[in-house]
Structures are given as structure tokens and as C-alpha cells.
Amino acid sequence: MKEVHMKRTSTKVIAAFLLGASVAGGVATAATSEPLGVKVCVDKRTQAIFLAGSNGCTTSRTALTLGAPTIDVKSIASLVTPTVVSIKVVAAAGSGSGSGWVYKSDRTSSFIVTNNHVIASAATSGVITVELLNGDTLPAQIVGRDIAYDLAVLKVNRGNLPTVTIGDSSKISVGESVVAIGSPLGLASTVTSGIVSALNRPVTTGTLGSESFVNAIQTDAAINPGNSGGALLDSQGRIIGVNSAIATLSSGGTSGSIGLGFSIPINEAKRVVDELIANGKSTRPVLGVFFDTTFTGTGAKIGRLSPNEGAEKAGIPAGSVITAIDGVKIADQVGAIVKIRSYAPGSTITVTVTLPTGGSQSFRVTLGTAPSN
């Protein structure tokens, strides 16, 4: 997991690494479209979900309530924990541990999503091992990874694993209850809960030349080193974020959770993950500008334009300062990059700028595409 140091001069968050469900065969999912408070029985062996009868559940099944008006952490943990895995990496470039979750599974193999920084040291050589809830350990291979989004996909040769249910991060609100599941400090299947503290929080992680830019979900659910790549879930057990970073005090006196955790929104992550599975590589959106890194004012100043890219085609002049994107205020260059990367290539966005000649103007810009690093 990455540790984050908050800078008081802006809303930007500079992060450092935090290292440390549907069921098998598509029988059922952790979240359903049933009304709130549906009573179900979960088969202890297969994890298949059945509506509870008038006499309750048999001894071979566990009684749970899905979608209760107040978040039912016990139910969510029981349903989703089997989809979350522990990841261990041993490599010459460094060893570590983290978390991941099963995204897709067929009869012979499964795809697992985690953070790039969890497995980066084994990108060229090393051993990656995935541990399931039942204690089974499986060798894993890297399918693809994206440094810019801090995401990676692993493959294991074990099929019919329970998979997590995908939620919609665009529909969550500040104050909503959430649950985090992962393996902090190697402690597998650790479950914590909290709320969504903020949305669209600009977070950068990594070092110069290998930075990740995340339009993060902020949560106060306890997230600690080793939680990287784990699941952030909504009140119905659907994944809405990939846990990636935590904030720490700049003094370095506190290295664990201080109630400031950050997750990659699942809508953003899913696009990248699907591309990695399909092609082994992914893409990122391009505005077509080079920012003036010496600019110290509010906003992101465009130093120059890329020929024939979106910004130039839209008529934005060089020297303009971006102040908002789709109505979201932009405080600085990082905020602009993070916001742009939250879109898919080909999206059309509204960019509001202060013109070099003075005055404000909005432009409709279609984002280009480029290979992600």
C-alpha cells in the first residue's frame, strides 16, 4: 500500500506505496437487485445463494440478510471474503505482500486484480504467489500492468473461483457506508468498515517517471500496509474501489491507518483491467497539452499544445490556464492530470480556461488516446 503525505498548499495528495461476490460458476452474486433486507441462505461449500424459506436455513447453509437498511458488515464479509486473495512477491528487486480480488473465473483459470506496485518488483523476474481463503497457494503470472493507473492483472491456473460483484463508483456519495477487505501486514481476510469521506481526491503515487495519478475515493475505513489491491465495497457488497494508498503524518511517526485511505474508483479501474486482459496493455486519454511546471498560480497552465490533438483542434490557445473540467475546479497541474485520466479515450469533455488575453471561456474537447506506461 502507498503512504501519503498531505500538502497544505493545495488539495493535492502525494502518496507513497502501501506495501506490505459472485460465487463459483456464476451461480449467484454478493449483491442482488432484490429489495432491501432480503433473507438468504448461503451454501457453506459452494457459496451459492438461495432465498430463505419460511423455516430458515438448513445446517449446511448460513443465514444472511442482503442489502439491509444499515450496512451489514457480517453479511458482506461472509459473501465477499472468499473473492479476496493475499499476494506474496519474492524477487531480486525486492519482496513484499499485498491483496487482490478475483475479477473473472472460468473452468480452468482466473484473473486477479491488484495494484501495480504490489507486483512491480517481479515484473521481469521473481515469483508471485496467490493465497486463497482456504489456504491454497497458487503461482501467478502477470497478464499486464499499468503504472499510470497503478493497476495489474494476474492469472492463476485454478478455475471456478468466486468472483467479486462489480459496482458503480459514479453512483456513490460522501457519507455512504463502505467495507474494506484485504491482507494488511499479511493478516489475510481482514475486514474494516467506515464511510466515503470524499470523492475526486487527486492522488499521485510513486516516483518521478513512474507516477500514478488517481482520481481517488477517500475513506476512513482502516487501510494499512498490505491492503494494496484489496476491495472497497458498498453497502451491498459490490466493489466500488481498489484500495491503493493511505495518508501518513509527514513526521513519519505514524505508518498505519490514520483514517485517510484512498481507492481507485472501479469504473476507472475496470476499463484499464479489461484492456489488460484483452491485450496485455492499456491506453490512457490525452488532452494534447504540455503543462507549464513553473506556474505557481491556481489552475493548470498550458505551456504548449500537441499538434492535431484535442486541445488544439478545440481552439484552446497556449498560455491558457485550466480552471475547471466538466465543472470540477482544477487547483493545479496534478488535479488536471488526475481528472483527465478519469475519462476513457474518446470522451468529450468541457474544459474551462482563463485565456492569455484575459476572460474565461469553455471549450468542448474530444480526448485522444495513447499507450499507457
Please identify what each model-predicted range represents.
Residues 135-137, 348, 360-362:
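A structural signal for beta-strand boundary/capping segments at domain termini and interdomain linkers
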Residues 68-297, 307, 337, 341, ...:
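Serine-dependent protease modules
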Residues 112, 311-334:
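Conserved PDZ fold ligand-binding element
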Residues 120-121, 324-352:
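PDZ domains, with a preference for the canonical peptide-binding region formed by the helix
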Residues 43-47, 54-56, 117-119, 158-159:
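Acidic glycine-/aspartate-rich tracts in secreted/extracellular proteins
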Residues 3-38, 55-78, 94, 130:
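Glycine-rich, low-complexity segments
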Residues 37-43, 87:
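A short beta-strand micro-motif
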